[in-house]
Each structure stands twice: as C-alpha cells, then as structure tokens.
Amino acid sequence: MRTKFGVMVAALGLFCVVAPAVAHHGFDTEYDANKKFKHSGVVKAVLWTNPHMRVHVDVTDASGKVTTYNMEITSPNSVQRQGWGRNSLLPGEKVVFEGYGGKVDESRGSLLSIAKADAPNKPLFVQGGPEAVQQGFPGAR
C-alpha cells in the first residue's frame, strides 16, 4: 500500500511540474501561426533578460502612426551562440523583422528573424529550425 501511495504522490508531483513547463513553452498558447508578418522599423530597446529576450521595434504605418512591436526571442545564451553580442543590435538602428503576432495583440509577437535594414539578406538572428541551419548559424539544429 505504501508503494502505491508513493508512486501516486510521485506521479502527481511530476504532473505538477511538467504541465506548467509545457504550457510555458507552448507557442500556440500566446502566438498565432496564421498571423505571420514582415515589417521594417527602428529598434527602441533590446532586453537581455532570462528566460527570453525581447526586442522592441517602432513601426510607422502609412498614416504616420507608430506601433511598438514587443518581440520575444529565445534566451540570451541561444542568441550568443548565433553570434550576437550586446552591441550587435542597438536602439536607433533600422531593421527588417519577421514574426508571428500574438493571439490578442499582433504587436506582441514571436520573432522569427531580424536583420539590419542595410543588409536585409544577412539576418542577425533566425529562430531555430531549418532556416537557421540553412543560414549557417552556429548552434542551430
């Protein structure tokens, strides 16, 4: 009886740890794969925070309205393995970026790639997967 109880407690404990981890890392809990976009804008801030970095980019539409896109990236460690340093992307720089918009707010998104406007075909960052491997980024799988 003690063994069964111990197994049940261990299973419940494992579930309590795994469920939040899966929910936290689930792309579709916050972002919409049907809201892919590509914009150009000016970097407002680069936040080197764990567990995920953020890049804020000001995008000006045709009417002159400025929207700040709050884009999530992977961890600082992962972007450093792709060759980023703290001076790779600075506030005030013009960029071209692609991402997926948020389910509630498109301007809070998941960053797919970002490049400086004067070198749009040389991204500084590509979010994992085949694109990163194809671009030859260190640490890409």
Predicted regions and their residues:
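Conserved hydrophobic positions within beta-strands
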Residues: 39-43
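Bacterial N-terminal signal peptides that target proteins for export
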Residues: 1-10
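Short nucleic-acid-contacting surface segments enriched for D/E, G, S/T with interspersed K/R
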Residues: 81-97
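OB-fold/S1-family single-stranded nucleic acid-binding modules
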Residues: 102-128
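Short boundary/loop segments of OB/S1/cold-shock single-stranded nucleic-acid-binding domains
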Residues: 23-37
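Short, structured beta-strand/loop micro-motifs enriched in basic residues and often containing a Trp
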Residues: 73-81
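Bacterial N-terminal signal peptides
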Residues: 9-18
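Short aromatic-glycine-enriched beta-strand elements
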Residues: 49-59
